[in-house]
Amino acid sequence: MVAPSAEIDLAPYIDHTLLDPLATPAAIAQLCEEADRYHFATVCLAPIYVRQAVELLYRRTPRVCTVIGFPTGAHTSAVKLYEAQEAADHGATELDVVVNLGWLKAGQTEAVHQEMAEIVAATGVTVKAILETTVLSETEKRLAAEICLDAGVSFLKTSTGWRGGATVADVKLLAQVARDRIGVKASGGIRTAAQALELIHAGATRLGTSRGVDLIRNRDTLEGETNY
């Protein structure tokens, strides 16, 4: 049974997210202000806005997170590595990296492992592996999670939100693989505080949502959420 929402402070779990390609610098400034006001874990935004966010959140609690190889994961390893290193050089301390799903489905597990391990080693920051669980079989989900865990990532993340969102079942599976050694991030379609709490009780240690402020303010059903 999910505990009453008053028992858990949702704010420290939230990656306050704005990955809309139409996002403007003004919208990013608002995102950062909200994250600081509500003490969210991070702001999660496109690489182009990392420097702006780092400046705005200097000496503030929220960290700066960006996405790598987003949303398809189908960039070359060299491009992903460059993107990750540049983001870290610009001050991002968390990177959400999309796994190469084509390689995974083709059984090219060494390539998946090497790509993720190189990013972890080269940047030295928190790396979250986005597995896109909504398009994977049960076996593929577990395999992807184990590969990324072995590659040294700090979190297993369910999804980009572009192909569906987090489910309780997927969070439980990732938590089983993680076994408290690394974190689990649930992302995509998180609309209510009750849903957020259910995911936390399933094992999520971080929540990616574009509706963090509404979750904190309203704690009831939200309409019209974007899924990323």
From Swiss-Prot:
Keyword entries, A-Z: Cytoplasm, Lyase, Schiff base
Predominant location category: cytoplasm
Pathway info: Carbohydrate degradation; 2-deoxy-D-ribose 1-phosphate degradation; D-glyceraldehyde 3-phosphate and acetaldehyde from 2-deoxy-alpha-D-ribose 1-phosphate: step 2/2
Record has Cell inner membrane as a keyword: no
UniProt catalytic activity: 2-deoxy-D-ribose 5-phosphate = D-glyceraldehyde 3-phosphate + acetaldehyde
Listed GO biological process terms: 2-deoxyribose 1-phosphate catabolic process; carbohydrate catabolic process; deoxyribonucleotide catabolic process
Name by which UniProt lists this protein: Deoxyribose-phosphate aldolase
Organism of this sequence: Cyanothece sp. (strain PCC 7425 / ATCC 29141)
Lineage, top ranks: Bacteria, Bacillati, Cyanobacteriota, Cyanophyceae, Gomontiellales
